From Swiss-Prot:
It holds the Pfam family Cytochrome_B. Binds 2 heme b groups non-covalently. Signal peptide: none annotated. It is found in: Mitochondrion inner membrane. The cytochrome bc1 complex contains 11 subunits: 3 respiratory subunits (MT-CYB, CYC1 and UQCRFS1), 2 core proteins (UQCRC1 and UQCRC2) and 6 low-molecular weight proteins (UQCRH/QCR6, UQCRB/QCR7, UQCRQ/QCR8, UQCR10/QCR9, UQCR11/QCR10 and a cleavage product of UQCRFS1). This cytochrome bc1 complex then forms a dimer. Heme b b566 binds at residues 97, 196. A ubiquinone binds at residue 201. Keywords: Electron transport, Heme, Iron, Membrane, Metal-binding, Mitochondrion, Mitochondrion inner membrane, Respiratory chain, Transmembrane, Transmembrane helix, Transport, Ubiquinone. One of its GO terms (molecular function) is metal ion binding. Heme b b562 binds at residues 83, 182. Gene3D superfamilies: Cytochrome Bc1 Complex, Chain C. The gene is MT-CYB. This is Cytochrome b.
Length: 379
C-alpha cells in the first residue's frame, strides 16, 4: 500500500516540502536560519495572541494594561518578555539569513530573494508598530519621529503624515490603527513565507559552493530535520536565558515611563535592530537627504542580483570578496552602536564614515573585487 503521506492531498504538500524534499548534501549550519525564522514567527504569533487578549489600544489605558499583564495575569510577565525578546531573536536570525544569502549568492534565485526582501520590510514594519503599543515615552516619541520622516516627501508629505496619524499628532487613532496592523501583519508574513518557500522549492536550495548539486541530493528528513531541531533547541535556550535573567537587556529604560507629549526624552532612538538604518538616516544633516539614504539602505538588497559581476555564484572561492564582505559585517555593528549614541562629536563623523563605507562596499568595492577575481590568472 502506498504511504499516506505521498497520496493524501494535504500530507503530500507537507511531504514534498519537509520530508522527501531533495536537499544538497553539503549545506552548513548557515542554512538553519530559515527554519529558526519559522519558529520565531510561530512563537511571536502565539505570544502576541495571548497578549492581545489582555491589551487595550487606548492612550489612557495602554500603558496600565501592559503593567496589568506583567503583574496580574498568570505568567503574563513571561509571555510579554518572550514576545519582546522573541522580536530580537527574530531579527538576529533574519540578519544571519540575509548575510548567508549575500555570502553564498542566494540572491541569484530572483523570485525567492525579492519575496525575502518584501518579508524583511513587512517584519520591520510589524516590529516598529509593536514598539509603539506599550505607550511608554520611547513608544510615543519613536512613533512621532519616525512617522514624521514622511513629511520630507515634497508636496504630499504633511498630508500623508496626518493621514497616518489620524489627526494632528500621534494619539488614540494612531495607537488603535497601529495595534490593528500589528495584529494582522504577522499573518500576512506567514502567507508570504509560504510563497517564499514555494519559489525556493521550484529551484531547490543553493549550497556553499554555489555549484548546481542535482546529482548529489539527499532527503530533507531525517538528515536536516535533526539538524534543525538542534538549531531550534539552541535558539530556545538563548531566548529562555534572555527572558529569565536579563529581560530588559535589549529594551529602553525610557519605555517604563508612561508617554508624555509635553516631555521629550533626551535621546530618541528605535529598537536596537533598527539602529544601523537610524545611524544612516542621521548621518545626513538634512531631513529629505536622510530619508533618501534610509530607504536605499535596505532597498539596496533588491539590487544585489544586478550587482553580481562574478563568474562564480558563491564567495567561497573569492578571497578579496570575502575580505570586503567581513568588513561590511563589521561596519553594521559600528552603525548600530552609533545609532544609539547622542548626536555629537565624534559620533557624527564616525556615523558618516560608516554610512559612506556601507554604500561604497555594496555598490562599488564588492562588484569591482568580483571583476578583478574573474580576471586573475588561473593556475
Amino acid at each position: 500500500m502506498t504511504n499516506i503521506r505521498k497520496t493524501h492531498p494535504l500530507m503530500k504538500i507537507v511531504n514534498n516540502a519537509f520530508i522527501d524534499l531533495p536537499t544538497p548534501s553539503n549545506i552548513s549550519s548557515w542554512w538553519n536560519f530559515g527554519s529558526l525564522l519559522g519558529i520565531c514567527l510561530v512563537l511571536q504569533i502565539l505570544t502576541g495572541l495571548f497578549l492581545a487578549m489582555h491589551y487595550t489600544s487606548d492612550t489612557m489605558t495602554a500603558f496600565s494594561s501592559v503593567t496589568h499583564i506583567c503583574r496580574d495575569v498568570n505568567y503574563g510577565w513571561i509571555i510579554r518578555y518572550m514576545h519582546a525578546n522573541g522580536a530580537s531573536m527574530f531579527f538576529i536570525c533574519l540578519f544571519m539569513h540575509v548575510g548567508r544569502g549575500l555570502y553564498y549568492g542566494s540572491y541569484i534565485f530572483l523570485k525567492t530573494w525579492n519575496i525575502g526582501v518584501i518579508l524583511l520590510f513587512a517584519t520591520m514594519a510589524t516590529a516598529f508598530m509593536g514598539y509603539v503599543l506599550p505607550w511608554g515615552q520611547m513608544s510615543f516619541w519613536g512613533a512621532t519621529v519616525i512617522t514624521n520622516l514622511l513629511s520630507a516627501i515634497p508636496y504630499i508629505g504633511t498630508n500623508l503624515v496626518e493621514w497616518i496619524w489620524g489627526g494632528f499628532s500621534v494619539d488614540k487613532a494612531t495607537l488603535t490603527r497601529f495595534f490593528a496592523f500589528h495584529f494582522i501583519l504577522p499573518f500576512i508574513i506567514a502567507a508570504l513565507t509560504m510563497v517564499h518557500l514555494l519559489f525556493l522549492h521550484e529551484t531547490g536550495s543553493n549550497n556553499p559552493t554555489g555549484i548546481p548539486s542535482d546529482m548529489d541530493k539527499i532527503p530533507f528528513h531525517p538528515y536536516y530535520t535533526i539538524k534543525d531541531i538542534l538549531g531550534a533547541l539552541l535558539l530556545i535556550l538563548i531566548l529562555t536565558l534572555l527572558v529569565l535573567f536579563t529581560p530588559d537587556l535589549l529594551g529602553d529604560p525610557d519605555n517604563y515611563t508612561p508617554a508624555n507629549p509635553l516631555n521629550t526624552p533626551p535621546h530618541i532612538k528605535p529598537e536596537w535592530y533598527f539602529l544601523f538604518a537610524y545611524a544612516i538616516l542621521r548621518s545626513i544633516p538634512n531631513k529629505l537627504g536622510g530619508v533618501l539614504a534610509l530607504v536605499p539602505s535596505i532597498l539596496i538588497l533588491i539590487l544585489m542580483p544586478l550587482n553580481h559581476t562574478s563568474k562564480q555564484r558563491s564567495m567561497m572561492f573569492q578571497p578579496i570578496s570575502q575580505c570586503l564582505f567581513w568588513i561590511l559585517v563589521a561596519d553594521l555593528p559600528m552603525l548600530t552602536w552609533i545609532g544609539g549614541q547622542p548626536v555629537e562629536h565624534p559620533y557624527i563623523i564616525i556615523g558618516q564614515l560608516a554610512s559612506i563605507m556601507y554604500f561604497l562596499l555594496i555598490l562599488v568595492l564588492m562588484p569591482t573585487a568580483s571583476t578583478i577575481e574573474n580576471n586573475l590568472p588561473k593556475r
